[in-house]
């Protein structure tokens, strides 16, 4: 019973951390990374399709992404989708390859992205704390139903707190790494 609550809390905290990593991947740094274009949707025969399904995206070098479009007739649509996305990127077509140079980040944009990263990290911390609160509430319910003793509840609560501390430390570590990445010129 107690182990199930701890495992559930641990799994949910892990999902929160994965969600944070995914959110951080969308925040653009000065370097080219294929995940930057993950949110771009292309109009493919009238239906919005993720860019990854119509083109192969690779980092050509530190500041350039190269896209190889599977269907040659889609080159203009892919180029338009990248331009209309709110990423501030200007693709250049060279034959069958679309190159997307990454503009250098200004100090102001870096600070804006850092603020965004901190907000994402804070929402991850809040999610982890809410998971802890839910787990502690479940433990209290077990005590009320006399399924576990108060000592067992206290021990389990300490273990849940350790899981929470570990998860929040991982959030802080991920934020620190992202901030360092953003501020590196």
Swiss-Prot record:
It is found in: Cytoplasm. NCBIfam families: frr. The gene is frr. Belongs to the RRF family. Keywords: Cytoplasm, Protein biosynthesis. Responsible for the release of ribosomes from messenger RNA at the termination of protein biosynthesis. May increase the efficiency of translation by recycling ribosomes from one round of translation to another. It comes from Azotobacter vinelandii (strain DJ / ATCC BAA-1303). One of its GO terms (molecular function) is ribosomal large subunit binding. PANTHER family: MITOCHONDRIAL RIBOSOME RECYCLING FACTOR PSEUDO 1, RIBOSOME RECYCLING FACTOR. This is Ribosome-recycling factor.
């Amino acid at each position: 019973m107690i182990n199930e609550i701890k495992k559930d809390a641990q799994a949910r905290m892990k999902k929160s951390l994965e969600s944070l990593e995914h959110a951080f991947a969308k925040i653009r740094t000065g370097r080219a990374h294929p995940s930057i274009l993950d949110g771009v949707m292309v109009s493919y025969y009238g239906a919005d399709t993720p860019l990854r399904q119509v083109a192969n995206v690779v980092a050509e070098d530190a500041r350039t992404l190269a896209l190889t479009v599977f269907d040659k007739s889609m080159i203009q649509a892919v180029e338009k989708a990248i331009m209309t996305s709110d990423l501030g990127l200007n693709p250049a077509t060279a034959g069958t390859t679309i190159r997307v140079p990454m503009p250098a980040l200004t100090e102001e944009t870096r600070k804006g992205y850092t603020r965004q990263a901190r907000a994402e990290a804070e929402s991850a911390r809040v999610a982890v704390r809410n998971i802890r609160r839910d787990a502690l509430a479940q433990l209290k319910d077990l005590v009320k139903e006399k399924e576990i003793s108060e000592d067992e509840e206290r021990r389990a609560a300490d273990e849940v707190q350790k899981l929470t501390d570990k998860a929040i430390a991982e959030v802080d570590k991920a934020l620190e790494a992202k901030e360092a990445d953003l501020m590196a010129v």
